[in-house]
């Protein structure tokens, strides 16, 4: 059974993002029930527009038992704190993206230790691939995308930008109550 409120939200989201015409033939996209979901399909060529989540990679970077966070310089959640993340470019691996984002957003070089997990939910437009890493060089600093970058003790974290940030940190510190042991393992 299709939930009309979900349908309305879906339609508004696509209208706001400008997806109204077929990328194949430029015909109009109209909502249809396809595979038991409301999807947009072309009225001229029957192309189906699948709204797929974008892959994003990030890193929980540690140094001296502290966690690197960046203060977001853009919406959503401007001014709140999160860890370095970014969209995975074609030709890049998730691991390369995580390392690149730490450098771009926080001015640090990171050696990845391991994959922590893959995160998403039903209303999310991204699939987030998160690594644990060790800061091997650089001093945290802000940039155009990040107002600030700092190291925080696990017990003294600022307000985080997203609910999933808390889940992800719980996964890290639940498995590794002492973040320094990750760093020692790496040396």
Regions found by a protein language model. Name each.
Residues 142-172:
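NUDIX/MutT-family hydrolases
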Residues 82, 109, 151:
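Short aromatic/basic micro-patch
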Residues 175-177:
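C-terminal terminal-structure detector
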Residues 1-76, 87-104, 108-137, 180-187:
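N-terminal leader/linker segments that precede catalytic domains of diphosphate-processing enzymes
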Residues 80-86:
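Conserved acetyl-CoA binding element of GNAT-fold acetyltransferases
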Residues 76-79, 150:
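A short local loop/turn or secondary-structure capping micro-motif enriched for an aromatic residue
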Residues 82, 123, 143-145:
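Short glycine-enriched loop/turn motifs at secondary-structure junctions
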């Amino acid at each position: 059974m299709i939930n009309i409120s979900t349908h309305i939200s879906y339609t508004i989201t696509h209208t706001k993002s400008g997806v109204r015409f077929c990328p194949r033939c430029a015909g109009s996209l109209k909502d249809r029930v396809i595979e038991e979901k409301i999807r947009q399909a072309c009225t001229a060529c029957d192309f189906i527009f699948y709204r797929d989540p974008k892959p994003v990679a990030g890193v929980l970077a540690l140094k001296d038992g502290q966690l690197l966070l960046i203060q977001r310089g853009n919406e959503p959640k401007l001014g709140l704190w999160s860890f370095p993340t970014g969209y995975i470019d074609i030709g890049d691996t998730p691991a390369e993206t995580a390392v690149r984002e730490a450098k771009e957003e926080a001015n640090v070089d990171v050696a990845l230790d391991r994959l922590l997990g893959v995160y998403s939910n039903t209303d999310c437009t991204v699939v987030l691939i998160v690594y644990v890493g060790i800061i091997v060089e650089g001093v945290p600093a802000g940039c155009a995308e990040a107002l600030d970058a700092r190291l925080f003790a696990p017990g003294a974290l600022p307000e985080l930008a997203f609910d999933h940030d808390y889940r992800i940190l719980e996964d890290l510190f639940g498995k590794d109550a002492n973040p320094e042991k990750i760093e020692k393992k790496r040396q």
